[in-house]
Amino acid sequence: MKVALVSYEVYPFAKVGGLADVVGALPKYLKNFSVEPIVIMPKHKIVEKNAEKFSYSLRKIKESISVPYLKTDEKFDIYQTFIPGTQIPVYLIANDYYFSAEQVYEGPDLAEQAIYFSAAVFEALKVLGEKVDVLHINDWQTGLVPVYLKTLYKDDEFFSKTVVLLTIHNLGYQGIFDSSYMNFSGLPDYLYNIDGIEFYGKINFLKGGILFSDVINTVSPTYAQEIQTKEYGEKLDGVLRLRSSDLYGILNGIDYDEYNPETDKRIYVNYSLQEIEKKYENKKMLQKELNLPQTNDVPVIGMITRLVDQKGLDILSEVLRYILNMDVQFVLLGTGDKKYEEMFKDIEKEFPDKMSANITFDIVLAQKIYASSDMFLMPSRYEPCGLGQMYSLRYGTIPVVRYTGGLADTVMEYDEEAMKGNGFGFKEYDSAYLLKAVARAVDFFKNKKGHWKKLIENAMKTDLSWERSANEYVKIYNKALNKRR
């Protein structure tokens, strides 16, 4: 089975968020399931800048390719590289007009850019002679790929057996643009209606992806259910309910080589479950680095996040002072809304021995927080998958979360009698329940040492591997292929 993963960002070539990590890692693990993966992405400016940093080279292999149907004469070249350490080819679509911005999601016209890329994918595959069984597209930027496949390319013999899987990483971003882009796209006018890509007088690229893909998944089973409700559906819940029988939830994995407490060079001291006392050496060194009193008797609560409402900052702001009045230390890393940046800085001044507010993004400090904290806080309003809780589990740091999306699928409430579970949480999006969950975790840390040790063991034994995820993806590739047979 040949699968082309199509994405705007892929680690290490261009990364803005978690999407890049997913598309950079998944192909490596698909190979273990008799899948032949290739990757297609735009050649953003940042891709060339990252080449030296991540030791990969770019080679131009095709040039001056036209994109029929579109109202443009812009041609594209194709560059090739490989996912580092593998022979998995990455094909980059290069065009100086559309992909000349410094960053991934920038450019003179984001709608035209996404339309151009989506249509160029088909011409690139033909020129390369890459007959793929599955086009695995990601988020709204690639949402028109299945629309082109089922309309303008439906009689093209080259794609007669090709199916599409759409992965929705965050339903909050949909690619909604003025209806005038229909003309540029070359897509048939009949698509501009409520059963097509029309959306409240505009066009919606993600809606096109949902309606025209053979199968759809999102990045956790719980989020797949949530987005079919009015509360989480972002006005697409009706469309998603329509496709309910083709909608799946697959948790992302994490890269076990990259996130490994036994070998991670970014943390102070390496450790394993067998040498868990070395985790506490990390804790003391983090306390020292951040000017907090060095003690193991007080739990360190870590939080690495964008400082926005979605991440639960509104309810946390109501109870943070109550939390700091417990015998705890709180370490924050992140940037975002100015009001929250200032709030954390103000609270740090009030509680200098208990609070360390690091208003920045620092990948090394992030790893140190995952490894050195006792607890990791994620009170999100919604969380499609969430990676923070996975990293913290891997490092034996106990998550305290709101049970939503991927958080509900990865964190299991600790059961004292059965000694099962790997964390603590709350369901109701309310600051009182958040406070209660933190208090419960602090109580276990201070007064139930045997249970705390068991929690760490359960956390570090949780299966968060890409192997598991890749196996699930192969199952739905096959479901899509069976639909077309």
Swiss-Prot record:
Catalytic activity reported: [(1->4)-alpha-D-glucosyl](n) + ADP-alpha-D-glucose = [(1->4)-alpha-D-glucosyl](n+1) + ADP + H(+)
The protein's annotated pathway: Glycan biosynthesis; glycogen biosynthesis
S-S bonds: none
Enzyme class: transferase
Gene that encodes it: glgA
Annotated coiled-coil segments of the chain: none
CDD domains: GT5_Glycogen_synthase_DULL1-like
Protein name per Swiss-Prot or TrEMBL: Glycogen synthase
Pfam family, one: Glycos_transf_1
Enzyme Commission number(s) of this protein: 2.4.1.21
Metal-binding listed as a keyword: no
UniProt KW keywords: Glycogen biosynthesis, Glycosyltransferase, Transferase
Sequence similarity: Belongs to the glycosyltransferase 1 family. Bacterial/plant glycogen synthase subfamily.
Domain of life the protein comes from: Bacteria
Organism per entry: Thermosipho africanus (strain TCF52B)
